[in-house]
Amino acid sequence: EKEQSFLIQEGFRILDTYGNHPSFVMFSLGNELWGDKNRMNDIIKGYKSVDTRHLYTQGSNNFQWYPCIVEEDDFFSGVRFSIERQIRGSYAMCDKPLGHVQTMRPSANMNYDNSILPNNKVKSNTSAIDENGYIKIQYGTGVKLIKADELENEFIPHVPVVSHEIGQYETFPNFKEIDKYTGVLKARNFEVFKKRLEDKGMLSLADKFFQASGKLAVECYKTELESAVRSKYLAGFQLLDIQDFTGQG
């Protein structure tokens, strides 16, 4: 309760400090949250009572396979509406099924309109729930068991939809960058990767791997972005930009 109170007050401090910033348009309570939906709704309501200029949402990709929209949500941010109704192009193996960028040939017709507003009934992910009512969810880089709520057969959004963390296509390391790390930060990971490749007798192919993986990443991003822009029912997307180490998507 003390931690929750601090986080809620931190939200008010964000509004007070950055509320006038011209780029402060949308406010999400957090990333991939689980918890009390009613409590999240009340928190948003409290923020709106102070500052109504922004668009608010309960979180980004909350409840993963079992998304919902609460009363105070101004938009929805997620990756799917059910196991089959996907709204981005790729998924991790722990978050299957995989997306169209991973499993299909590029298409000039691919879009997410039928996933957002389906013409036909679709399956929900009830098969993933075990006999005790638990389901495995993605948790960090692993999995975690949580109690699954009873699911509705179909979830139709009534607010603008934003696709969450699209992209994430990686490239092979460019070992020529190792010498550029002249400060306190060293490219130890690159050194390990280079040694592994050398041990396998493939170091001479490093540049080709770098070029080929870069070209593949460009094609994947092209397919992903064009599918999103082509979707008339998709209000926008969040392009993940993680650069913890060079080459990460």
Language-model features, listed with the residues they occupy:
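Active-site mouth of glycoside hydrolases
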Residues: 1-75, 79, 156, 237
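Acidic, His- and aromatic-enriched active-site or binding-groove loops in soluble protein domains
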Residues: 76-89
